[in-house]
């Protein structure tokens, strides 16, 4: 297994090898954002990369949006696109080291980018940084993908084994409005902290 450290991710951005990056908000996540009414929600996007999700939220009046990423280049890309985005909300850190608490966490290609051995720890960490009744919402791949490098795939049964101890499963179903090249390969998830 390759080391999925800061150098690995910075090199992906330097070499423009960001095949996971849609260059826009994923349609299912945009649809979810568009129905949110509480602009005061404290939102985290872990492993957010270029985070078009953060940009969309910020430009639509959500000012409590945080992005955490190992890659300083990805965070600089966000700042270049949105100069008014607060520096204090661009967290150059390892997600597993953060301690702040959030109302909502958005999952968009982070879970599939971490070493699969860290998945139980991911579920536990998400639970610990969510406020009472907080939610994890986003997309998980529902497909067998790579075994030695990201993106790593999985399936609903596997994911339930990680999340059921910590969350009420409001939704974990095939996504009907995925981006065209991800059709039939994604689950839309909405989990609420127990």
Task: Please identify what each model-predicted range represents.
Residues 109, 113:
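Short catalytic micro-motifs in class I SAM-dependent methyltransferases
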Residues 106:
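A conserved beta-strand element that flanks and buttresses the S-adenosyl-L-methionine
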Residues 1-45, 49-100, 114-194:
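Class I (Rossmann-like) S-adenosyl-L-methionine-dependent methyltransferase catalytic domain
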Residues 103:
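Conserved acidic residues
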